[in-house]
């Protein structure tokens, strides 16, 4: 994996944005607030389940998957939200996957992409997303704040992704209410759950926190449960032969 993966993907995103048209803004799909839902679920660790056919770190994960059936299983198993990869080049996703899944389920859906422009946000909303991802490492603080405010004004919720303390401070500073801690370093692609554990002492009481990446086992979920409201899990579920059982295994009671 290239040491400058993030910069490589951001250059690709700039090229994609240049080709995007200005879509008229539609209404946000009706569902519950992810923030409100996670705030109320104090006794159980929730799961954000991901539809991800491939990734730069793992290669092809499950290319033949029926994404709508996978989404149906996620919702039936009690997922808090479904994350859908919309990046085509690096993750073999598609905005049409987001549209298909959002049309099918009643729970929130997350547009999982490297968002750098308002046009991407509008496209995600129009495809049925109720939550978008903004990555602190991908944007200047000023630009992050602009896109955060833009999405919020449209009625979307925003998952702001961090990886270290300085990024967490930025997420807090811009007023993010749903904050992700990515255990994967987007420069080197190395994964460590210690990232989540190290940042947990700096969490604020009026926000919700999601641990992302590298989560495969009940033991790992138990380790993270005291500090996080939810886990974002993709590869473990995409490779599982029993999705419902895997969701149950990771959606543990919080002691």
Report each predicted region and the residues it spans.
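Glycine-rich phosphate-binding active-site loops on the catalytic face of alpha/beta enzymes
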Residues: 126-143, 180-188, 228-247
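Catalytic cores of alpha/beta
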Residues: 116-128, 164-174, 211-233, 247
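C-terminal helical cap(s) of enzyme catalytic domains, especially alpha/beta-barrels
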Residues: 196-203, 239-255
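Active-site beta-loop-alpha junctions enriched in small/polar residues
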Residues: 12, 50-54, 87, 114, ...
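N-terminal active-site wall of soluble small-molecule enzyme domains
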Residues: 46, 59-108, 112-159, 165-170, ...
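Conserved, mostly hydrophobic/aromatic
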Residues: 9, 49, 74, 82, ...
């Amino acid at each position: 994996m290239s040491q400058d993966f993030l910069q490589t993907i951001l250059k690709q995103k700039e090229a994609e944005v240049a080709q995007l048209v200005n879509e008229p803004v539609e209404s946000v799909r009706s569902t519950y607030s992810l923030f409100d839902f996670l705030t109320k679920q104090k006794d159980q660790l929730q799961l954000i389940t991901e539809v991800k056919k491939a990734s730069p770190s793992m290669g092809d994960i499950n290319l033949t998957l029926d994404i709508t059936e996978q989404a149906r299983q996620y919702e039936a198993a009690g997922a808090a939200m479904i994350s859908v990869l919309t990046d085509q080049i690096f993750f073999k996703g598609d905005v049409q996957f987001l549209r298909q899944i959002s049309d099918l389920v009643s729970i929130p859906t997350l547009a999982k992409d490297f968002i750098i422009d308002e046009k991407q946000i509008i496209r995600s909303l129009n495809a049925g997303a109720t939550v978008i991802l903004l990555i602190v490492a991908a944007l200047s603080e000023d630009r992050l704040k602009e896109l955060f405010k833009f999405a919020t004004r449209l009625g979307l919720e925003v998952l702001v992704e961090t990886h270290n303390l300085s990024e967490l401070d930025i997420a807090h500073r811009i007023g993010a209410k749903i904050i992700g801690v990515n255990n994967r370093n987007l420069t080197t692609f190395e994964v460590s759950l210690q990232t989540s554990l190290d940042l947990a002492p700096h969490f604020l009481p009026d926000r919700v926190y999601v641990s992302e990446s590298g989560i495969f086992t009940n033991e790992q979920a138990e380790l993270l449960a005291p500090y996080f409201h939810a886990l974002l899990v993709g590869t473990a579920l995409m490779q599982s032969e029993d999705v419902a059982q895997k969701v149950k295994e990771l959606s543990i009671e919080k002691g």
